[in-house]
Amino acid sequence: MAGNGAIVESDPLNWGAAAAELAGSHLDEVKRMVAQARQPVVKIEGSTLRVGQVAAVASAKDASGVAVELDEEARPRVKASSEWILDCIAHGGDIYGVTTGFGGTSHRRTKDGPALQVELLRHLNAGIFGTGSDGHTLPSEVTRAAMLVRINTLLQGYSGIRFEILEAITKLLNTGVSPCLPLRGTITASGDLVPLSYIAGLITGRPNAQAVTVDGRKVDAAEAFKIAGIEGGFFKLNPKEGLAIVNGTSVGSALAATVMYDANVLAVLSEVLSAVFCEVMNGKPEYTDHLTHKLKHHPGSIEAAAIMEHILDGSSFMKQAKKVNELDPLLKPKQDRYALRTSPQWLGPQIEVIRAATKSIEREVNSVNDNPVIDVHRGKALHGGNFQGTPIGVSMDNARLAIANIGKLMFAQFSELVNEFYNNGLTSNLAGSRNPSLDYGFKGTEIAMASYCSELQYLGNPITNHVQSADEHNQDVNSLGLVSARKTAEAIDILKLMSSTYIVALCQAVDLRHLEENIKASVKNTVTQVAKKVLTMNPSGELSSARFSEKELISAIDREAVFTYAEDAASASLPLMQKLRAVLVDHALSSGERGAGALRVLQDHQVRGGAPRGAAPGGGGRPRGVAEGTAPVANRIADSRSFPLYRFVREELGCVFLTGERLKSPGEECNKVFVGISQGKLVDPMLECLKEWDGKPLPINIK
């Protein structure tokens, strides 16, 4: 990215630079964002600010979290621009917003430049704050991001403002003092006039100006300056300085930057969760084969498939699923449903949109976006429209639709996961108790997910087609950039709710598969022992043909879904005993013996260990071995690349296996994950799942 107005002769239209920004994988880009967000110092000079850095400063309370430094090399150019304005006025120059009125009244003239700046701030202080605690104030995190982005823009030296003002705003940032800005009231063209006027109002000491300190106290401008250590009193703005602060897109682009940081992380998370979904559903991993996606050409889908392929290639679940799917293949669907099988094709375009939106916002936070632009080298004040925040509005609309589509896929996968008719042998509603009549598992959670998804789909509608003309029809088209960014922030919150809920459900499914394997192993072991003990001889003391039925009995167990007989494996009314009876009866009929006696003996010995969710002390409804980690069959998740995510939920966050016998509700556990995601704690375990990926799909092997 060429900074400070430099033109690259080989790329005069900037298309080459825009294309180059998309080189490499999306995952690598997310890793870079995360690294940038963890830098202790953000040094800005006007053209190199990154989304991750904006997110970091937004979430930090003050310099102890992230310190902001100004590049001293910017001082001369900022000073030159400021001095040019004063010199131009002294020689009778006529400049918009310096000697003229504003917007639709720019035909008016004045020679009192400082007074004009005072009136600019007064009439733009049009925001409504309510009581100050009822949701009408912009969150301080967004204000911090806006201050950072505005400073970055003004450092480029095209705006006619003193460097000392930028230093003062930086001191406010570093001491955790955030001006109070109204949540609403901007159309982001001509910039974010109304909210930015409150930043200018604070540094000029307007009596209505307020700020919030790092400990949440509200203070006036004088106290804010004292806390920040700004000496010399309030600023009296020179001509153009008020306009330089307010006439820009920095609030919309700042919020958009923080939103896009989260959107990129959640996009990668959706890829990982789709792979985990395949694991717990005993899915068929061939949907990730590189040839399929290479033939469709879309890079987002190719990468999404490669990421899922990587996780599934190292999955113990997939080895087991292969065995399961090989049993009676002609009686099973040949392919999985769309929510799994087309997940790369669904997520790929969303990732492409999110990447493009991220780069557009990154260009905007490094742009000169006020009016007029002061060209010191040519001695001109260029009157244009860089304040038009259309890149923000359009990018946010596009990103929000992509976020809604990610949520739609997540809901479709979740709905399959909790539905016993679709989840390939898992329990109804992922219930974890012995008695399914007293455990409805994730039923309420599915209702909540439907609510989240519905609201998210509504938010997917565009904002930018609702533009209203303003300022005496001077601002007859405007971007609504901040409005769209706010709605995208809402969409991100809802996707976090959905992701949290889905993660808890997937971990429940992982443990149910573990339970399933141990129950089946226990039943097989018991049937084998009982068969060898009691089926060798018939009641008359002769060798029984039933002694040859052991293999068929084990095969019948393999073919029967464990949770159909989990209440009591020895119950004659449940499917397992009916299938075992059929095996013995077939042997009896073929040999002329009576099979009922053998079945009765088998039942009398009770298939112990097959009561899968018995209330063992401390087991939370699971057999003691599974609950205590001493089960004969280990949990396959420990031998899968998705394990770091599971470990994070179960160990770091302490989320438990849910059963009707416990008081712990699904919402309590989902909330733990939601807080973890919101605090950024999920990023490391998510990336750990992919640490071995080399950025390439598996090779296409031709036999």
Curated annotation (Swiss-Prot):
Disulfide bonds: none annotated. The active site is at 96 (proton donor/acceptor). Pathway: Phenylpropanoid metabolism; trans-cinnamate biosynthesis; trans-cinnamate from L-phenylalanine: step 1/1. It comes from the Eukaryota. Pfam families: Lyase_aromatic. (E)-cinnamate binds at residues 247, 335, 341, 371, 443, 471, 474. Its EC number is 4.3.1.25. Residues 608-627 are annotated as: Disordered. Signal peptide: none annotated. Its main location: cytoplasm. SUPFAM superfamilies: L-aspartase-like (SSF48557). There is a cross-link at residues 189-191 (5-imidazolinone (Ala-Gly)). It catalyses: L-phenylalanine = (E)-cinnamate + NH4(+); L-tyrosine = (E)-4-coumarate + NH4(+). Optimum pH is 8.0-8.5. It is found in: Cytoplasm. GO terms for molecular function: ammonia-lyase activity; phenylalanine ammonia-lyase activity; tyrosine ammonia-lyase activity. NCBIfam families: phe_am_lyase. This is Phenylalanine/tyrosine ammonia-lyase. It comes from Zea mays (Maize). The gene is PAL1.
